[in-house]
Amino acid sequence: MWPGVPPRATFFPNLCKGADDAIHGLIRAGALILTGTDAPAPGVSYGVSVHSELELLVADGMSPVQALAAATSVAARAFHLSDRGLIRPGMRADLLLVQGNPTENILDTRNIVAVWKRGIRVQRQSATR
């Protein structure tokens, strides 16, 4: 979702409709759904594309809380990564601080204020390295 760039449905309307219908059905059925992107495919940026994925999951029927879990605790559990996915002592502590409340409005995940990687705050200019 870049300013001035048409949404994906403009280019692939039938493909997107089918994918949205499939995800909607899986959500209703209670299937285990994780976030995922096509990065590093052309036009798909690391990080930013996860925010778009969260927005699509909410548009397809997940609550914001379910979508956030799909990107964190559910994904960690699915890949047997017991040191991440939750905020509690002993965990890896890769964290985002955002302005707003993404459990109510998933768009607030884009309002990043600060980032911690393995418990250490990352300075903004080095975050892309």
Positions of the model-derived regions?
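His/Asp/Glu-enriched, well-ordered alpha-helical/loop segment
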Residues: 1-101
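C-terminal cap of metal-dependent C-N hydrolases
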Residues: 71-73, 89-129
